[in-house]
Amino acid sequence: MYAVIRTGGKQYKVSQGDVLRVETVAGDAGGEVIFDDVLMVGGDEGLKVGEATEGAKVTGTIIRQMRDKKVIVFKKKRRKNYIRTQGHRQNLTVVRISGIS
């Protein structure tokens, strides 16, 4: 059985036992998280999309909170002595999917 969930403005295809890196979800390591925004559920019984997925939930366990690799933002205007460098590290949560219902 698999499902498509939406979290952090992105969509993920998940099945039981998968490990995902998603945008920050509040909680501590070992805590449980519930994804209510299920877009599609598929399996042996067939495919459910849209209103048929109301009431579907995907549960997972938070493995750890982490930060992604640094992305460097570099701006320059030629001949004007203007250079700006800025770094950004996105906060992520590593989640193991424990069930789809």
Curated annotation (Swiss-Prot):
GO terms for molecular function: rRNA binding; structural constituent of ribosome. One of its GO terms (biological process) is translation. InterPro entries: bL21-like, bL21-like_sf, Ribosomal_bL21, Ribosomal_bL21_CS. One of its GO terms (cellular component) is cytoplasm. Keywords: Ribonucleoprotein, Ribosomal protein, RNA-binding, rRNA-binding. PROSITE patterns: RIBOSOMAL_L21. It holds the Pfam family Ribosomal_L21p. Disulfide bonds: none annotated. PANTHER family: 50S RIBOSOMAL PROTEIN L21, LARGE RIBOSOMAL SUBUNIT PROTEIN BL21M. This protein binds to 23S rRNA in the presence of protein L20. Part of the 50S ribosomal subunit. Contacts protein L20. Belongs to the bacterial ribosomal protein bL21 family. This is Large ribosomal subunit protein bL21. It comes from Magnetococcus marinus (strain ATCC BAA-1437 / JCM 17883 / MC-1). The gene is rplU.
